[in-house]
């Protein structure tokens, strides 16, 4: 068979015309150091701050330090399998995390990967972990209450949807319990909750998840966990991952509660990373931008304007103090960023006052705007009464001769302290909170022995549920008090049926 040169040349030309180059251009570098969750790489001249990079073993990292000769990278995964001399390449992307309804009821790590053994997750939607907070014109004043179900909080330091309220106190003073109770109380309130556990023991997180599951709260809750055994980079990004998940719901007109437990451990993880990356240390060896670390996170919580759907994201950050020192560096930083703080005190906790809220040091900068009308009426003077009681109580230790007015104030104060106590994982509906506070402030408890106050409360709720449910419904529906004469009459009717 004769070979025709023109046929061969036309075939070659056709092949050349149809050729599509199947190659990828990537800027690569070489790892010069790795250890303790960070790596340094030479050769990534065009890397951007916050850009994701990929190591040769598939582990991702984030560019943090852009130095003249090399790039400081935080490793988002197992850094033990990375070796000096390995290649690392730029991806041209920033870090994103899976978001969406599919995450509800799941426990995930800060990279959005499930750690609960309930199968793979693929939501089909992602959001950047670091995002710009809503601007001034995109926000609206906080006006709707977020009921925590805890009398001491809803009456004294009310929280509104879209607020940032710091929970601060020593270890083992019930900070996590306050947040878990607040999550439990959101059942049926059209609220999605995100619990971010930062640097907690894995056994502790498991206990919290089991509590939420047992009490039906995982139906509207996402748990993000970066446990104490994980590398510092994961502890550092965990709160931002939780905020990104919350923003997805907020920008779709929904209401979200995000609990950051706790930001002290995130600050310590960030300090560790910064020192390893050789950034200049400042006060207490924290880097200069440790304030910005928390402000850019907490500013993402907002009540959006009606034009943007009116959604909200409420933040409950935790800070752990040492020996009750709320003037420490990180504590004062976060106090100045948030819209109020709830201070949990050691002495109160160990004397049996739980939740151990110190009314004098706790404040909500939103205040009455985050309370229903009925609660405003019954709790108006409660805070001042409690503060003056504490003062009088301290004063009476030095003398016993008291006039009747002082004695009456002390008696009312002791009953107030009892009323504000609450058992664990038993959040109370707002109408019942209003009822017991009304009974307290209108003197119906003055003749009840202090030790019997909680028993009186339980029996009164049962009596009202059985005989005066319509009065409770008035509070639920109108958000206002029913006629005072009717309430007084009902409480007296209850007292007549008991020994009080």
Swiss-Prot record:
It holds the Pfam family ATP-synt_ab. ATP binds at residues 169-176. It is an enzyme of class 7 (translocase). InterPro entries: ATP_synth_asu-like_sf, ATP_synth_asu_C, ATP_synth_asu_C_sf, ATP_synth_F1_a_nt-bd_dom, ATP_synth_F1_asu, ATPase_F1/V1/A1_a/bsu_N, ATPase_F1/V1/A1_a/bsu_N_sf, ATPase_F1/V1/A1_a/bsu_nucl-bd. The keyword Transport applies. Keywords: ATP synthesis, ATP-binding, Cell membrane, CF(1), Hydrogen ion transport, Ion transport, Membrane, Nucleotide-binding, Translocase, Transport. The record marks 362 as: Required for activity. NCBIfam families: atpA, PRK13343.1. F-type ATPases have 2 components, CF(1) - the catalytic core - and CF(0) - the membrane proton channel. CF(1) has five subunits: alpha(3), beta(3), gamma(1), delta(1), epsilon(1). CF(0) has three main subunits: a(1), b(2) and c(9-12). The alpha and beta chains form an alternating ring which encloses part of the gamma chain. CF(1) is attached to CF(0) by a central stalk formed by the gamma and epsilon chains, while a peripheral stalk is formed by the delta and b chains. This is ATP synthase subunit alpha.
